[in-house]
């Protein structure tokens, strides 16, 4: 499989923010880091972006879409936006410190 080439601008569009939750930080024991990504991002784009921005080797990318909840605002129902997350597994010996700025 050929390596996907994307622009620097698209890399920073794909990796929006790290997810800092108890469940996401438990994945660090298994060399996993979780990021928020756009709904149209593909696994190969996510892999290329993480490798390009952080300079690490990615072995796997798993994605999930969390559906937006129905909430009420001023008595009227509304829907929160859907959120796509990517769980990125890094190669042996590689790590990303998400607590520091990029």
From Swiss-Prot:
The protein's name is Large ribosomal subunit protein uL23
Species assigned in the record:
Paramagnetospirillum magneticum (strain ATCC 700264 / AMB-1) (Magnetospirillum magneticum)
GO BP annotations listed: translation
The GO molecular function terms of this record are: rRNA binding; structural constituent of ribosome
- State the family named in the UniProt similarity comment for this chain: Belongs to the universal ribosomal protein uL23 family.
Keywords from the named record: Ribonucleoprotein, Ribosomal protein, RNA-binding, rRNA-binding
Entry GO CC? ribonucleoprotein complex; ribosome
Its subunit composition reads: Part of the 50S ribosomal subunit. Contacts protein L29, and trigger factor when it is bound to the ribosome.
Q: Does the keyword RNA-binding apply?
A: yes
Please describe what this protein does.
Answer: One of the early assembly proteins it binds 23S rRNA. One of the proteins that surrounds the polypeptide exit tunnel on the outside of the ribosome. Forms the main docking site for trigger factor binding to the ribosome.
Q: By its UniProt entry, which InterPro entries does this protein fall under?
A: Nucleotide-bd_a/b_plait_sf (IPR012677), Ribosomal_uL23-like (IPR013025), Ribosomal_uL23/eL15/eS24_sf (IPR012678), Ribosomal_uL23_CS (IPR001014)
